[in-house]
Design a protein with these regions (language model features):
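S-adenosyl-L-methionine/SAH cofactor-binding core of RNA-modifying enzymes
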Residues: 89-161, 165
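Histidine-anchored nucleotide/phosphate-binding helix
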Residues: 52, 76-87
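Short cysteine-rich clusters marking metal-coordination/redox-active sites
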Residues: 39-42
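N-terminal amphipathic/basic-hydrophobic helices that include classical n-h-c signal peptides
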Residues: 1-14
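Short Cys/His-rich local motifs and their 1-3 flanking residues in nucleic-acid-associated proteins
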Residues: 44-47, 51
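Short metal-coordination and nucleic-acid-contact micro-motifs, chiefly zinc-binding Cys/His arrays
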Residues: 35, 45, 61
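C-terminal folded domains that constitute the principal catalytic or ligand-binding module
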Residues: 145, 153-266
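Short Cys/His-rich Zn2+-coordinating modules
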Residues: 16-33
Length: 266
């Protein structure tokens, strides 16, 4: 042990490194640090609240969005599903959490999944383009129940394969997807969208109202603008960085496979 000689009140004390460590530890406050004030609506610290970007009056489309959310998504600090829920009237965006659906705890979900107007937004092999559907009100089309899987791509895929009830739903996919406007976050590939962007774009197609998308993206624009003004930088997708040979990390087999499936640029 290393010994240290400390003089206190004209007396010399011999202290080992362990003694010093315990003395320093005793100076640490037992009380937890004060938490930052949080917004009562979005639950984020007030300084980084994105609620000013929400519509002044919550939107009330005829269709509704059903989010099947992986439990791990709740821990993500920059998740966008709450933006979707807070931008729509109560009952127009319902969230169920789990890794398999439906379960007994998911009250009312089984009935929704059995509804003939319920559709799933998921790129399964037989999925058709969402814009091929009649918008609400066209040819007597009733309001849709739009099911979204919320999580990383591996998590969403796991939810789908663990939930046989989802196999029975009509599956659709977005085509001609615009670039993500979530510019402070790195997306896996070009064409990947956040949950908010996916829901907003899909809902605007089903409702036949393109203005819905612009209004619903308000909180995302507000968040990105704030972060960029305070030191954040614009992110490109992993796919873009890899193609430009500027991605700083080795890529995994899953992403490499996805990139091989993409069409070559002319």
């Amino acid at each position: 042990r290393v010994k240290n000689f400390i003089c206190k009140n004209s007396q010399i004390f011999v202290m080992t490194n362990e003694d010093i460590a315990w003395e320093e530890l005793s100076k640490i406050s037992a009380d937890p640090p004060e938490a930052r004030d949080k917004c009562i609506q979005c639950k984020r610290p007030v300084a980084v609240c994105w609620c000013p970007g929400l519509p002044k009056q919550r939107l009330c489309p005829e269709s509704r969005i059903i989010i099947l959310q992986h439990p791990a998504e709740v821990k993500r600090c920059l998740r966008t599903a709450p933006m979707l829920a807070l931008g729509l009237e109560d009952g127009k965006c319902m969230t169920f959490r789990g890794k398999k659906f439906p379960l007994p705890k998911h009250e009312g979900l089984a009935e929704i999944l059995n509804d003939k107007d319920t559709i799933l937004l998921y790129p399964s092999p037989g999925a058709m383009a969402l814009n091929k559907l009649d918008p609400v009100g066209t040819n007597g089309q009733r309001p849709y129940n739009l099911v979204l899987l919320d999580g990383t791509w591996p998590q969403a895929k796991a939810i789908y394969h663990a939930s046989p009830a989802l196999y029975l739903l009509r599956a659709y996919k977005l085509v001609g997807v615009p670039a993500s406007e979530y510019v402070i976050r790195t997306q896996p590939t070009e064409g990947c969208l956040s949950t908010l962007e996916t829901g907003a774009l899909a809902l605007s197609i089903l409702e036949g109202n393109q203005q819905l998308r612009n209004i619903m993206l308000g909180p995302l624009h507000y968040l990105c603008r704030f972060q960029l003004e305070n030191g954040a930088v614009t992110h490109q997708s992993k796919e873009f960085l890899i193609k430009q040979k500027t991605y700083p990390k080795l890529i995994g087999r899953r992403l490499a496979k996805q990139l091989r499936m993409l069409p070559e640029e002319s």
